[in-house]
Amino acid sequence: MKVFVIPYYLWFGYVIIPVMYLFFKSREEYWRAFIFLSTGMTVFLIVSTIWPNGHDLRPAYLLGDDLCTNLIRSLYKTDTPTNLWPSIHVYNSLGVHFAIIRSDLLKDKKWIHNGSLILCLSIIASTMLIKQHSVFDVMTAVLMSIVMYYLIYNRDVVTTYRANREAKKARIRY
């Protein structure tokens, strides 16, 4: 399934474009997405520092000289199979998808919601199909994203933090 290298590379734009859109259009929604993504990346860096990890799932040789095979070869050369757990591709893809579907700015744009879901699931599948991540890497990233979804969107830690900060400022003034 070497064609799945394409959604793997699309991940970069999939993360950057919606985050930049939210930055310019809705600071509150941007901060939710930012906290979601940066928390996951921080956890990833801490885990990788404390417990370096990797896998040996990749094939020894890749046959073929087509575009997708060459993209996979390039990926294998530049992105070693180390420090993979939990999968940042999976976690950030889910984080961006959650930001899109929970955005007030995009609530009436079902075609964006559907396109985001398809790309998100394609990216998640790609991480395993091109042998970049194991099922364990993917499932732990999914679990992490579920926990963060609850904190960011159900508990709304951003609004709670702002309210507490404003209350503290008000107490200091009086």
Q: How should each PLM-predicted stretch be described?
A:
Residues 14-18, 94-99, 118-126:
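Hydrophobic, membrane-inserted alpha-helices
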Residues 108-121:
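Short hydrophobic alpha-helices at membrane interfaces in multi-pass membrane enzymes
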Residues 41-49, 118-128:
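Aromatic-anchored segments of alpha-helical transmembrane domains
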Residues 9, 13, 37, 41-45, ...:
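Alpha-helical transmembrane spans of integral membrane proteins, capturing the lipid-embedded, hydrophobic core
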Residues 24-108, 159-174:
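Membrane-interface loops
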Residues 61-62, 81-85, 122-149:
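Interfacial helix-loop-helix junctions of multi-pass membrane proteins
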Residues 1-15:
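Interfacial helix-start motif at the membrane-water boundary
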Residues 97-102, 145-153:
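Hydrophobic transmembrane alpha-helices
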